[in-house]
């Protein structure tokens, strides 16, 4: 079982903690991680693109000239696709780009990225993370004490308003709950700060 240091929020070591090998100690599967990221990014697409076809463009109800005798090509509407200002043929319409991977694949992906963080020594397990008041300066001091200088994902066991509000103005820092941890967030942040209680929740779900 992988063993990592356990820290308190002052940045001091408070011992070690053994992580579940089936969650934090597997061989990362890069292909599955790639598929999971594609799925998440597809779900983030707005999909509100829209163009008008010939029936939706304003005007064009009258035949521009008679069928025969003018020497010009026959036309039925000035909103036909070949006209300037006409409708678009087979243009984009509003749609959802989201799709779902199988549950086992999604679980393997999140286990893979968590294991990668352990392998790269980019995971910091905290005994607890509590703030009495909303104070960005205090949160910044905690991160500095833990030598977190780049993008960091903070994972708490439950909703913690003081932590979330204190961290939201710090560039590159994101706070999520254990039940909302996802592949894209973990990959997009160099450091993973997770509380001991959150580790237990993640292991309970994924082990």
UniProtKB/Swiss-Prot annotation:
Keywords of this entry: Ribonucleoprotein, Ribosomal protein, RNA-binding, rRNA-binding
Record Gene3D superfamilies: 3.40.1370.10
Region (Disordered): 48-89
Bias type Basic residues, positions: 60-71
Pfam families: Ribosomal_L4
GO biological process: translation
Assigned GO CC terms: ribonucleoprotein complex; ribosome
InterPro entries in the record: Ribosomal_uL4, Ribosomal_uL4-like, Ribosomal_uL4_dom_sf
GO molecular function, one term: structural constituent of ribosome
Superkingdom of the organism of origin: Bacteria
Function noted in UniProt: One of the primary rRNA binding proteins, this protein initially binds near the 5'-end of the 23S rRNA. It is important during the early stages of 50S assembly. It makes multiple contacts with different domains of the 23S rRNA in the assembled 50S subunit and ribosome.
HAMAP family listed in its UniProt record: Ribosomal_uL4_B
Similarity-based family: Belongs to the universal ribosomal protein uL4 family.
Oligomeric and partner information: Part of the 50S ribosomal subunit.
Name of the protein this chain belongs to: Large ribosomal subunit protein uL4
UniProt organism field: Bacillus velezensis (strain DSM 23117 / BGSC 10A6 / LMG 26770 / FZB42) (Bacillus amyloliquefaciens subsp. plantarum)
């Amino acid at each position: 079982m992988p063993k990592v240091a356990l820290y308190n929020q002052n940045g001091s070591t408070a011992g070690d903690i053994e992580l579940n090998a089936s969650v934090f100690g597997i061989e990362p599967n890069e292909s599955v991680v790639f598929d999971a990221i594609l799925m998440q990014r597809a779900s983030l697409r707005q999909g509100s693109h829209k163009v008008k076809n010939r029936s939706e463009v304003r005007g064009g109800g009258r035949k521009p000239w008679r069928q025969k005798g003018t020497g010009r090509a026959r036309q039925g509407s000035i909103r036909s696709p070949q006209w300037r200002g006409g409708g678009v043929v087979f243009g984009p319409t509003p749609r959802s780009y989201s799709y779902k991977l199988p549950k086992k694949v999604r679980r393997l992906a999140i286990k893979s990225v968590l294991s990668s963080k352990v392998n790269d020594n980019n995971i910091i397990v905290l005994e607890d993370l509590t703030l009495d008041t909303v104070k960005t300066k205090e949160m910044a001091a905690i991160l500095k004490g833990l030598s977190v200088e780049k993008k960091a994902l903070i994972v708490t066991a439950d909703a913690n308003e003081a932590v979330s509000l204190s961290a939201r103005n710090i560039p590159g820092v994101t706070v999520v709950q254990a039940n909302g941890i996802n592949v894209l967030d973990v990959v997009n942040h160099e450091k993973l700060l997770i509380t001991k209680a959150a580790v237990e929740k993640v292991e309970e779900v994924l082990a």
